[in-house]
């Protein structure tokens, strides 16, 4: 280390010591004023008792720190897997104003991980369900729900009244929008994602000098590589841990723990299996050429609100519409045809869901082969026949998946790659069949 570097390090250490000392003096002065005039306390006696064990932690700066939280506001976008663990800890910590953006409703399939909601709230708006819980948890916190889908048209109006944004969404499209709006308004974003047994989180646009989401990810991922909890699954405690970690970072921002001198861009990664691991990676700072936060930025409020920036087009989407109407049948025709005992040559029913899905619930006499397996097989009918007994070139084949998306891709592959002539996709898939034909089958 050079003499200059040692000198700079010494100065930074001295600045940090002075900051801590200044905070302590402010805290002592605030407390002294409060005690001299008990009728003019900065918080109610209930709040002192409620937050007491938090205030005596050195890192929270005592009463001064608690007043920072009381006067702070946090917007949580998404009251799902990440939002549910985040919200009660924000309210419990005494954040003065909390906003919740979510237009989705509670579903039974959410409850294993979205533990802020419960069985009797199935069908209720998630934002309203969460608001009810927070109001009961801490009456000293003001909670506003926004039961709307966040868009380029409403994001600026919603964001403007909040100090910190928590991005608890689950799509790249939403993350780009949130980051872009936050940069334009000068708001920091705590952003996280979680899937299966893993998760990650970062802070974007710290103090208007930190990198934004576009700096980390200039190009969106291919739509085919993006998986949702609905498709890929998620373990509740794993996403819960990441959501709670988001609150820790939000508190650091609000308490002033991070400064321009000590903040370093990072990516925190959590993995729950096979061993629990938590790793922190140092990331690069702002990109000079970033269109959102760089020197010649083009992602402006006007370009966002006017729709010039098309987030859906930028991020892309999977194209499942690869069949004609003649190549598809509805579940009612499927029910009539598949179980037709008078048919001399039975249909071959292919279920192209992942094998783990298939093991949970499936129709009798079906054969399980995934879309990826079909893609990987050499283009020869003999290879396909080795996987599916009784299949021949003139077989009548019906294809089923979970929702009727992958089955369309599989039908196209069977016809184009393996030259099968009579292949039909079942619209809406296995779940549509359960909903409209046989609700006694397990729906997961």
UniProtKB/Swiss-Prot annotation:
Name used for this protein in its record: Adenylyltransferase and sulfurtransferase UBA4
Residue positions binding Zn(2+): 212, 215, 290, 293
Keyword entries, A-Z: ATP-binding, Cytoplasm, Metal-binding, Multifunctional enzyme, Nucleotide-binding, Nucleotidyltransferase, Transferase, tRNA processing, Ubl conjugation pathway, Zinc
Chain's role: Plays a central role in 2-thiolation of mcm(5)S(2)U at tRNA wobble positions of cytosolic tRNA(Lys), tRNA(Glu) and tRNA(Gln). Acts by mediating the C-terminal thiocarboxylation of sulfur carrier URM1. Its N-terminus first activates URM1 as acyl-adenylate (-COAMP), then the persulfide sulfur on the catalytic cysteine is transferred to URM1 to form thiocarboxylation (-COSH) of its C-terminus. The reaction probably involves hydrogen sulfide that is generated from the persulfide intermediate and that acts as a nucleophile towards URM1. Subsequently, a transient disulfide bond is formed.
Binding-site residues, ATP: 81, 102, 109-113, 126, 170-171
GO cellular component: cytosol
Organism the protein comes from: Kluyveromyces lactis (strain ATCC 8585 / CBS 2359 / DSM 70799 / NBRC 1267 / NRRL Y-1140 / WM37)
Pathway info: tRNA modification; 5-methoxycarbonylmethyl-2-thiouridine-tRNA biosynthesis
Similarity field: In the N-terminal section; belongs to the HesA/MoeB/ThiF family. UBA4 subfamily.
Major place of residence: cytoplasm
Gene3D superfamilies according to UniProt: NAD(P)-binding Rossmann-like Domain, Rhodanese-like domain
Taxonomic lineage of the native organism: Eukaryota, Fungi, Dikarya, Ascomycota, Saccharomycotina
UniProt GO MF annotations: adenylyltransferase activity; ATP binding; metal ion binding; thiosulfate-cyanide sulfurtransferase activity; URM1 activating enzyme activity
E.C. code: 2.7.7.-, 2.8.1.-
Cofactor: Zn(2+)
Cofactor note: Binds 1 zinc ion per subunit.
Residue intervals of the Rhodanese domain: 343-442
Residue numbers annotated as active site: 229, 401
Compartment(s) of residence: Cytoplasm, Cytosol
Transmembrane segments: none
Top-level taxon in the UniProt lineage: Eukaryota
GO BP: any one term: protein urmylation
């Amino acid at each position: 280390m050079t003499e200059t570097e040692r000198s700079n390090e010494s100065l930074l250490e001295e600045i940090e010591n002075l900051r801590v000392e200044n905070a302590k003096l402010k805290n002592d002065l605030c407390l002294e004023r409060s005690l001299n005039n008990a009728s003019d306390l900065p918080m109610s006696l209930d709040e002192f008792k409620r937050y007491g064990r938090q205030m005596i932690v050195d890192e929270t700066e005592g009463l001064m720190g608690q007043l920072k939280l009381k006067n702070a506001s946090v917007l949580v976008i998404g009251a799902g897997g990440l939002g549910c663990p985040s919200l009660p800890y924000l309210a419990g910590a005494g954040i003065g104003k909390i906003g919740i953006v979510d237009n989705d409703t509670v579903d039974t399939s959410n409850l294993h991980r979205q533990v802020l909601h419960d069985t009797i709230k199935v069908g209720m708006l998630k934002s309203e369900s969460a608001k009810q819980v927070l109001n009961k948890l801490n009456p000293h916190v003001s909670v506003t729900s926004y039961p709307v889908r966040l868009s380029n048209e409403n994001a600026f109006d919603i964001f403007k009244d909040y100090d910190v944004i928590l991005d608890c969404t689950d799509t790249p499209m939403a993350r780009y929008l949130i980051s872009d709006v936050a940069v334009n308004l000068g708001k920091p974003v705590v952003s996280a994602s979680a899937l299966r047994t893993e998760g990650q989180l970062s802070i974007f646009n710290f103090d208007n000098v930190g990198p934004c989401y576009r700096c980390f990810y200039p190009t969106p991922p291919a739509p085919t590589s993006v998986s949702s909890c609905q498709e890929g699954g998620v373990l509740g405690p794993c996403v819960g841990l990441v959501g709670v970690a988001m609150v820790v970072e939000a508190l650091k921002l609000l308490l002033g723990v991070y400064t321009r001198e000590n903040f370093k861009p990072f990516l925190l990664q959590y993995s729950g299996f096979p061993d629990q691991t938590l790793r922190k990676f140092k990331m690069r700072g702002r990109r000079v050429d970033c269109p959102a936060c760089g020197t010649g930025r083009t992602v402006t409020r006007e370009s966002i609100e006017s729709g010039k920036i098309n987030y859906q087009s930028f991020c892309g989407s999977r194209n499942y519409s690869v069949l004609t109407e003649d190549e598809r049948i509805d579940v009612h025709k499927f029910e009539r045809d598949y179980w037709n005992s008078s048919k001399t040559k039975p249909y071959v029913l292919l279920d192209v869901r992942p094998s783990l899905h298939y093991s949970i619930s499936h129709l009798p006499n079906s054969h399980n082969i995934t879309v990826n397996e079909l893609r990987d097989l050499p283009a020869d009918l003999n290879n396909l026949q080795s996987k599916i007994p009784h299949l021949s070139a003139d077989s009548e084949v019906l294809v089923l998946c979970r929702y009727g998306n992958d089955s369309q891709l599989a039908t196209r592959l069977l016809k184009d790659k393996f030259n099968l002539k009579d292949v039909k996709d079942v619209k809406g898939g296995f779940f549509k069949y359960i909903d409209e034909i046989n609700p006694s089958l397990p729906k997961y």
